[in-house]
């Protein structure tokens, strides 16, 4: 034991001496730079300041107390004098970024941290990444993207008009400007919208994911070694998840789709991803991961920063109405000079050089920069002289944009006040000097690549919002900012109405009331959906549409659709249609069908799968489960044609109702052979169940557990009746809704309070349908928002619940990102893709718009007899 004690006794004094000498060294190193005492010993104060969300204010106050140079860490010096800008941020190489920027890199297991133009410390790598794409960000190239910006502006206007323009409904404008900024970057980067504006909310956790990334990276940047320990290693990534992944997933998805040819750029305007891929393909020196790095920068840095500046301009214009009035006057004159007094989006050439608009934007950049921590640099071996002090090699120096932009000798004593006029009345040379002083976009060789995109986007947006609308902030005192490297703004509740002087003609949307926002859980997972035409035609008489016969009606030929849903290698079938040997159904049902006007059925669904020779190679043996939307004969098909390994999934209460099937239960509609010899799963929509989830207005169950496909509780038509909702694309999310018999005919849900009848529908047809309803004993409904066909109680044992279900379906039917498919909608035949082709690209092909009112033509023909 003695040797151990002796060793400890010898080591302990050495350890104490090391710690003591280290502390003395820290006190001595940079000892001529003033600052708080504890900052000389540790970076912990810096980390704590950032965690408060108001580090920018603390930095400003420190410079008021200690002067131009403040030591805020053992090796870190904060500088407040703009005269040092060209020294700290030169145009030459040799002053690299500090380890603060390591924390800004997303980490991918197996690959490591992804360097991008903004965060790379290796100056040679930075040159390799920036050089090939710098020309894409020149204003001459950015101007080519203007049509894509205008397209997104129109979507924003449509949503403002539909949701808020009454002037009485308050909303947080900062959220909507963030949605807009992200949609712009999505459109110009990928030719895709994320869907934030249409939905009025975050999708796939993208926005919250970026903010969460910044909230963790900003404090870690003050002590970068902590980031390596807590986040940037394989073990941490496995336990905590991968940093930056919501954005990386989107970027990877779109790059893969573009490379494989599954997605294309806008046919009129080459998006940035296309240009990135062309550059990488034509230059062997550019690494293969470069397009990912470039697009990641666009999404994560180019969106939040622009949204911050947009919000700053609008908030200050509203709280300083005299500046709003002056800007409106300038824009009105520019609109007159443009020669199009009805235009609500002015072209870039008309607003680019407007002095007061430019002053407002520059003042926003100055008073509220998007990034408000230090832009750190490592002092090179030659050292630096700053503000008369010699800074030794290895020290870290940096300037905070918040502090530099409030330099009183440069910008005046009122630096904390919004005053766009400070940018007016200068010579061109002096104005450029002022613009070069603000640090909002960085300085020197690492100045922000996307500056021109941001300026154009912000000026386009601000000019449009001011020209077209009158804005009122509800309570300016509720406005909040939180600094976690990026700024997050909130509490900016406003009301809006059209300017009385503007003849505003919104884009036709056929909507009279905005449907409730669909709160569908976010997910990055999708399924592939194929609509199967089961090759069955059933002719129906009036009883599906009206209470009693209608003169001239000769019947409708109704198809039956099933759905093949694929999640990777897992395949399920939603409904099976009518079995081919329907004469073998229970006698009561077989007799009913025998007396039907007309029925033809050519094959069972399993045979349709097995006979496919297109190379898809999804056969009956591959089906994991058959899902019955309900137990009626035209949906249950023949499960016995699938192997015993295929389970049967039914809604709540179906098992007890069917009682083992016919002949065991003589009163049921299904056969014993449908049920026997296979696993049967009865879905529970109990809110306490692990897989239960709220999906828009429906109670649902997440079938695959990844948010790609939901079974929805849709009662009314029968016991255990279910619908399905499949997510078929992300960023933006689009869905296919499988309505089952929640509604039998599109005329029973269209038009609706959310979707008015188009003017091009023949009035003669509308009169016929309204008259037919009255003649058959129903109550004729008038107006362009009432369904053309009645909702018959005879078809729905629980009419109250059925009405609730159909109202929910109407909400989904009115949403641009949901394609509602009714299984008996004959107007879809020949109008959409059927098995074996998938229908995931319905949105891109415009199938919802092209088929929405086709049933009217079908009804006109049916009533011509």
From Swiss-Prot:
Cofactor(s) needed: heme
Signal peptide: 1-23
GO terms classed as biological process: secondary metabolite biosynthetic process; terpenoid biosynthetic process
GO molecular function, one term: monooxygenase activity
EC number: 1.-.-.-
Keywords tagged on the record: Glycoprotein, Heme, Iron, Metal-binding, Monooxygenase, Oxidoreductase, Signal
Chain positions carrying an annotated carbohydrate: 340, 510, 604, 667
Residues that hold heme according to the record: 448
InterPro entries per UniProt: Cyt_P450 (IPR001128), Cyt_P450_CS (IPR017972), Cyt_P450_E_grp-IV (IPR002403), Cyt_P450_sf (IPR036396), Cytochrome_P450_monoxygenase (IPR050121), Metallo-B-lactamas (IPR001279), RibonucZ/Hydroxyglut_hydro (IPR036866)
A UniProt-annotated Pfam family: Lactamase_B
Enzyme kind, highest EC tier: oxidoreductase
Function: Cytochrome P450 monooxygenase; part of the gene cluster that mediates the biosynthesis of anditomin, a fungal meroterpenoid. The first step of the pathway is the synthesis of 3,5-dimethylorsellinic acid (DMOA) by the polyketide synthase andM. DMOA is then converted to the phthalide compound 5,7-dihydroxy-4,6-dimethylphthalide (DHDMP) by the cytochrome P450 monooxygenase andK, which is further prenylated by the prenyltransferase andD to yield farnesyl-DHDMP. Further epoxidation by the FAD-dependent monooxygenase andE leads to epoxyfarnesyl-DHDMP.
Family affiliation: Belongs to the cytochrome P450 family.
Protein name (database record): Cytochrome P450 monooxygenase andK
Gene name, Swiss-Prot/TrEMBL: andK
